[in-house]
Amino acid sequence: MRGVETRIQEIRHKIFTEVARMAYHTEWSVKDRMEALPYKIIPGEKGNFRNDVFLERAIVGERLRLAMGLPYRSAAEHSPISDGIEAADKDETYYTPPLINVIKFACNACPEKRVHVTDGCQGCLAHPCMEVCPKDAISLDRTTGKSVIDQEKCIKCGRCASVCSYNAIIVQERPCAKACGMDAISSDENGKANIDYDKCVSCGQCLVNCPFGAIADKSQIFQTIRAIQSGEKVYAAVAPAFVGQFGPKVTPGKLRAAMKALGFADVFEVAIGADLCAKQEAEDFLKEVPDELPFMATSCCPAWSVMAKKLFPEHAKCISMALTPMTLTARLIKQHNPDARVVFIGPCAAKKLEAMRRSVRSEVDFVLTFEEMTGIFSAKHVDLENIKEDPAGVSDASTDGRNFAVAGGVAQAVVNVIKRDHPDQEVKVANAEGLKECRQLLKLATLGKYPGYLLEGMACPGVCVAGAGTMQAIKKSQTSVGLYAKQSTHKTSSETEYIKELDKLVD
């Protein structure tokens, strides 16, 4: 639903804005404010969306807790919304797993999957639906002449739906489960959505595909602002997918000016880290494939790499050991600014999971999504479209580095680095987007179908510009990123001034 302003986006934006306002108003009691906010966000005597004002406020209360980085509470728990706030009210606090949470009393308990005959059935003479059903689950209502499905016999194959000339048979799936490429969502004893965290890779696709807004992730909005207010030098590292996310008129120069207005010490585009990553992966590919590894898979998408290691542990070594663009950018910032604290701002929920790794925690201090950033801008009344542009922009990455955010961009960047130094080197590439496709790609690779290949995997259908923390329509984002990438003065990743820093960063 990216690019469509729904009630869910409206509520999320209000919550992010209010959490940011709490952080800025140090004179307020955070505990008291937390208890009062559900009444501000859902005012009056009547619910706006569910016709139950108490339920709506309870849901907002849990959303507030998660936005503060606090654990989700079940409806059975009796405790204040602000319970545990003392731990969250510190800029060094980092949330604990799980990152993605189902607010059970917000869940609609949608059917997992069912095949349903609608009123569109015309009771035709042919009844092809009956003929193709492998379980004889479809019969004829002699009164109306319309088809009826015996749900006890139905195996949900959908063949009947595919042959209906009137499209009168539909296959309904729970939206969150359908979006989950890891098959990590099932039903609990009450029919509510339940996440299997042994399978979940925190891509966040369930979050953006739930029409009831019952799934939410944790945030560091509050802690980031408090770090800035404490006087620390906080640097923003903005992911390549940022173009257009804050409005069609918001240029990189305006974004930089807006970030500086919030108190950030400086702003860098993570595309410079993407350039470094492409160079490192190119060197590793030339060194290891095919002599040491049968194939090499890219490393920049954390949900993809975690999935690969969960499901194909025997081929874990085939996932590139190159540092991700986020980590490389953070290291670069801290190498030149030892006292810096780094905030990664991007499209991705899984980057929050990556930043929780022990090896990354010292590099990346906070992770925010583009959507969460809009709440911070709103809280400080920063008008991004009309702010005076900073001519410095956000740095000078290559075209290939900026194209990391779109399908095929990562692999192409690596190939271009290799081709620049080894023009006769053949590099075969295969890529997949969406975890279902990624799983199939890796399965085929482990069976020997992609010998000597460079594999690019991206967990989100539509790649980074379609991440869980984005707001702009996906096609529009793809176009925006492509146009911005073409403006770079460097084509390939190995041409940028930052490449000379790589050896220092990966030692």
What are these regions (language model features)?
Residues 1-79, 84, 217-507:
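Iron-sulfur-associated redox domains of electron-transfer enzymes in respiratory
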Residues 87, 95, 155, 175:
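Short sequence/structural segments immediately N-terminal
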Residues 89-118, 135-136:
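N-terminal [4Fe-4S]-dependent radical SAM core
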Residues 108-116, 139-148, 187, 205, ...:
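Gly-rich Lys/Arg/Thr-decorated short loops/hinges at beta-loop-alpha junctions or inter-strand turns
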Residues 111-114, 127, 158, 204, ...:
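Short flexible coil/turn linkers enriched for glycine and charged/polar residues
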Residues 124, 155, 171, 201, ...:
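Residue-level recognition of alpha-helix initiation/capping sites
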Residues 126-151, 159-196, 201, 205-220, ...:
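Iron-sulfur cluster-binding cysteine motifs and their immediate structural context
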